[in-house]
Amino acid sequence: MKNCNQAINSREYKLILNINQFYDRTHTVERFGNLVGSLTQQFKGKVISQQTEEKYRHIYYLDTPNFDLRHHGFILRIRREKKYHQPKYQITLKHRESDRYLSASQDLSATKPGKTKFEEDIIPPFQSKFSQSISVTKDRQPNFENIKQVAKLFPGLKALDIPEQTSIGLVNNFRAFEVVKKLANLQFGDKHIVKTDLSLWYLNTTDNLPLIAEFSLKYRLPKKLLESPKKLEQFPMPMIQGTNYLFKALQQQREWINFHPMTKTAYVYG
């Protein structure tokens, strides 16, 4: 195990919404965005920019037949999206754990250049989980056939002692078409930004009603603090307080909230 004393560099608050609100996506997104803006102003925040961008991605998860990765707290996710009119494949290995030190101690190194993240995920009413991840982007679709091939990219998986020839395949034969809708950038009392977006999963591109709808509020540690070892995890207090108030207020909007939520990963694994 590596050093478990890692600093959190981002926080993400997640709400699973009532999918029955989303028959008309354009109208619903506008209504929900207005609600977020109104509540933000109640807590002395402001909307500094409205977003109109939609991203479209295809997503699937890979695991062994017995879900060995999942049982060890890992997920292996593939995202396909077009960038500059060319398909790109983002391969993400993530470890999620209630104990931040156990999550931080995992070896998520890669043999190719990748983007790393150690973040706190917050779900209702206010429960934290911690995830460490690394994402590697490739021009071609990955073709993993067994654990040995996955561990060639992510060598830390060798420590799980899963037999090398254990096959890897699509989890529950499930693929999602994802629409990511950027909503707005928010500020609470200072210049730091809280980003908001909606993630909607569909079985097909033509479906009207999503399988799952997730709203997220997220912020990263400002760059100047990331680069200062003496100021690690010093998230600005006005941003924390405002985001917390908004997150709790949204949970009171009964028509919008799914009170028997299932995360996206849980949905895939069933």
Residue ranges of each PLM-predicted region?
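Phosphate-end processing signature that detects enzymes handling 5′-triphosphorylated RNA
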Residues: M1-G270
